[in-house]
Swiss-Prot record:
GO terms for cellular component: cytoplasm; endopeptidase Clp complex. Keywords: Cytoplasm, Hydrolase, Protease, Serine protease. The gene is clpP. It is found in: Cytoplasm. Belongs to the peptidase S14 family. Its main location: cytoplasm. It comes from the Bacteria. CDD domains: S14_ClpP_2 (cd07017). It is an enzyme of class 3 (hydrolase). GO terms for biological process: protein quality control for misfolded or incompletely synthesized proteins. Its EC number is 3.4.21.92. GO terms for molecular function: ATP-dependent peptidase activity; ATPase binding; serine-type endopeptidase activity. This is ATP-dependent Clp protease proteolytic subunit. Cleaves peptides in various proteins in a process that requires ATP hydrolysis. Has a chymotrypsin-like activity. Plays a major role in the degradation of misfolded proteins.
Length: 210
């Protein structure tokens, strides 16, 4: 289910389960997927988005009414890839609970905030960061202008998404997004990016429970 680099494959533990037909082995991430747990680890790109979206859709087909848990430890990445994950989270019928562990920066913070209301969590030593999208432009002046306009449109769209999920005003979001804004979990809760800071997991957090 997961496509890791060769060096990373050696570091992914295998889980052996006994069945009526003998032993069956899973990599740890595929085993956790059976419990409706998905991991977003590392940068957000098209390959990662394809994996996350396909798992969300698969779990919806398995049970459209049972929650899905998305654990996030990401520095962010490509806006288009992040929005593909975001749209899929909103599109499917199960509610998606989000949990930040380590960091949720840039698009990672947007996906953290996009979890189901009341089901957005952070571990106590995580860091959360929001900022405006960036991009490089090259080519003719007219091409640079077109790319700059597209970045401005993306910034406006991202601001609207943060407004929707945090409850902050557009002016507040625009001001906070102007530069990198790092937050502790407590600050992220006050800002509306998450609902709770958790040290121990209650049964309803991160186990795919409805």
């Amino acid at each position: 289910m997961y496509d890791f680099e060769p060096k990373m494959n050696a570091l992914v533990p295998m889980v052996i389960e006994q069945t009526n037909r003998g032993e069956r082995g899973y990599d740890i991430y595929s085993r956790l997927l059976k419990e409706r747990i998905i991991f977003l680890i590392g940068g957000v790109n098209d390959a990662v988005a394809s994996l996350i979206c396909s798992q969300l859709l698969f779990l919806e087909s398995e049970n459209p009414s049972k929650d899905i848990a998305l654990y996030i430890n990401s520095p962010g990445g490509y806006v288009s890839a992040g929005l593909a994950i975001y749209d899929t989270m909103q599109y499917i019928r199960p509610q998606v609970s989000t949990v930040c562990m380590g960091q949720a920066a840039s698009m990672g913070s947007l996906l953290l905030a996009a979890g189901a209301p009341g089901k957005r969590f952070s571990l106590p030593n995580s860091r959360i960061m929001i900022h405006q999208p960036s991009g490089g432009a090259q080519g003719q002046a007219s091409d640079i202008e077109i790319q700059a306009q597209e970045i401005l449109k993306l910034r406006s769209r991202l601001n609207d998404i943060y407004v929707k999920h945090t409850g902050q005003s557009l002016d507040t979001i625009e001001a906070x997004m102007e530069r990198d804004k790092f937050m502790s979990p407590e600050e992220a809760k006050a800002f509306g990016l998450i609902d709770e800071v958790v040290e121990k997991r209650p049964g309803s957090i991160g186990d795919g429970a409805a």
